[in-house]
Amino acid sequence: MAIEARDAEYHQSIKDALRSMGLSPKDLTAWLLRHPESILHKLGSFSADDQRKVATVTRYIRGTNPSVAPMTALRTAGALVYYSAKYGIPVHLSTAVAHTESRFDPKAVSNKGAMGIMQVMWRVHNGLLQANGIATKDDMFNPEKGVAAGCLLLSRYINAYGSIPKALARYYGGSSTAYFRKVNTKMANIRSSIYPQ
């Protein structure tokens, strides 16, 4: 009965996204029982609009990188929507950065040591991240914590530098027109998916 009650909490867009990946709300509920710390426990309490964003971003992730496992895509999308709102940044920005940085691969590691979906440099930011509940460098490979780290940094850079282009240059580690163009193109694509005319 508890599983059926939880099913009703999910917006139809979430149910449709799950179905498109061969899953159901019951599969999600069973997964949540095994993962008590997941941000997806909050999914049923997200507004209908935010649940629709999670569904749209999940489909975007799977569409751009089908090798991302269905639950990883849903966790990543849930984290992108949740932490973008928490840190006051547009979800299409955080999603575009994750796509550009790693193609949504939570195990990605750059040759410079950037890790996870958002390609965060643990050795540079560990103090800030630990102060915000991201305890170890292995947390960078958890899609939800990796997204939390990236959104936190993007928010700080936007606040410090006053614009998205300057924040992206800082996030990237230097000025790069090519990087900004990639992120900007992806932002436009994601924005049109999330906010169709």
Indicate where each model-derived feature is located.
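N-terminal secretion targeting segments of exported proteins
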Residues: 1-9
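Catalytic glycan-binding domains that act on GlcNAc-containing polysaccharides
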Residues: 29-197
